[in-house]
């Protein structure tokens, strides 16, 4: 790793390639998802070691319900088990865990486990770890607008005073800084409805590596690439 690296405060990752990775090995897609969950644990620990303050991963999108039912069922089972594993990792690395997305469609037992995990880790002062489950960027914005509209109707919010900051307070990510770096694995170059509001000035890094093979070294490569970017935020800098 290069010396004197500037570490991004917030890294977001689109975990892509689990199914293709498994297929290439002659295994079912569910095997890829299981290995991908293990990779999440490894990257959480490395992010904490590197000094990354916030890590957000895209685990299950609002569109993923359209996958074959057996795959959805397997993902929900994996999610149930992961909640237990995540709590152990959180205790080890002082992680504060927060789940983004519309939880209302999730089974009650999963919602309960999520609530228990968030409550148990809310005061931890290490890595802030966000997991996007049943999450879609458009859906998040719509839900935020509905909540804000209710406040306007009740007279609690003056519509004339609404700003971008006002709406941000109703997003799933309220209180969390926007990502500095977005990593997408397996060579895909699209957002897939992830953090559409928050990625306005985020730097992108596309990794050719499928998520189950994404290692600590790959995370370091992404951060090194980030260090060579010139972030202008819409401004023109003197040459």
Where are these regions (language model features)?
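Flexible, compositionally biased loop and terminal segments
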Residues: 1-239
